[in-house]
């Protein structure tokens, strides 16, 4: 059984010509949503994926608008509302050294170089120059915000699901 990656969520239809409004969850929109690419729609409350081929893609405000081959009207795509767009995990692109997919980082435990267990990564924010990993503290209290920079993140061990950090002054306060 194959594993799947979510690459977007269909939040609504757009117009009457079969376009769907997608909230993207991929960093590779130009590749994932290009004409001819196959995506799979996991409709709400369904256990089966529907294979669709992208006919066109364009940006509109903060959304991606997609049309699928063989779905020329709003009536054809109405059932996709609320569905997730997915691709098989084998379709993910290769990443460079020190680059990770969000799903690989979320859930990893975070420890200091001194061995103190801090918590688990629950979310990743992308505010600008670098990602920020949100760590849910083991001891309760406020979440920690860990910048993904060389000075702080010393090691990421995906096999052990563990991230080792060297906290900067004030980071753990």
From Swiss-Prot:
The record's InterPro entries line, in alphabetical order, gives: PRC-brl_dom, PRC_barrel-like_sf, RimM, RimM_N, RimM_N_sf, Transl_B-barrel_sf
Record's keyword annotation contains Chaperone = yes
Q: Which domain of life is it from?
A: Bacteria
PRC barrel domain spans which residues? 97-171
Q: Give GO terms: molecular function aspect only.
A: ribosome binding
Q: Where does the protein end up?
A: Cytoplasm
List, alphabetically, the Pfam families matched.
PRC (PF05239), RimM (PF01782)
Gene3D superfamilies linked: PRC-barrel domain, RimM
Chaperone as a keyword of this entry, yes or no, is yes
Free-text function comment from the UniProt entry: An accessory protein needed during the final step in the assembly of 30S ribosomal subunit, possibly for assembly of the head region. Essential for efficient processing of 16S rRNA. May be needed both before and after RbfA during the maturation of 16S rRNA. It has affinity for free ribosomal 30S subunits but not for 70S ribosomes.
What interactions and quaternary structure are annotated? Binds ribosomal protein uS19.
- Give the matching NCBIfam families: 16S_RimM
Q: Quote the record's domain comment.
A: The PRC barrel domain binds ribosomal protein uS19.
The name under which this protein is listed is: Ribosome maturation factor RimM
